[in-house]
Amino acid sequence: MSLVLIHPAPDALWADARLEGVLRHALAGREVRTLRRAEELDSLRNQTLLFAVPLGELGINLEYIRMLARLRREPSLLEGCTAGLIVDGAGELYTKSAATELALAVNAAGCALLGRPLVEGTGSLANFAVQAHNLGTDLAGAYRAAARELVDRLEGETFPRRELPNLLALHASSHHTSNTMALWGQVRPQLEDRFSTREIGLRNGTL
């Protein structure tokens, strides 16, 4: 299976040095196509994707921001894709927030995320202390091992696809007074051609 590496070019070359080494280890022996620019994010439907984002000292990568904007602008850009994420930071901040916004954007663009989809490398790699101890290696070695394990799982992942999935909506609200039910009333008609929907009200302890 071919893997698509989406690896936004860093603002400064030094910001990508560590992540480059991690990727060489994680992707060794694999067939990989690499995309570095937002304008290259075309014809990606039903692909297996690995996002690898190098953040600078301030948690910013301008090419990544351009990619993020495109993902938010084109809701079917990654239709049918499966993805994992590696976010590498120069400091102790911003990796988690960057990963959160990226996960939301790729999911909204039609992409399913792997279970435990994130490998996060903070500046000190202190978040790998436990893994390093368990593996009998240093922090950098644990980081590389986590990235490799993510790619292994990503390549082996298959999401079951059903022609008409069942969707059950449980609620304990009144159709007349609930904002949540009003929202569901707007969402449900948009799903009925793709899902078999059933709604059950749980009120006053009854089913």
Per-range role (PLM):
Residues 201:
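Conserved acidic residues
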Residues 204-207:
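Cysteine-cluster motifs in flexible loop/terminal segments that predominantly coordinate metals
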Residues 1-198:
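FMN-binding flavodoxin-like domain, especially the glycine-rich phosphate-binding loop
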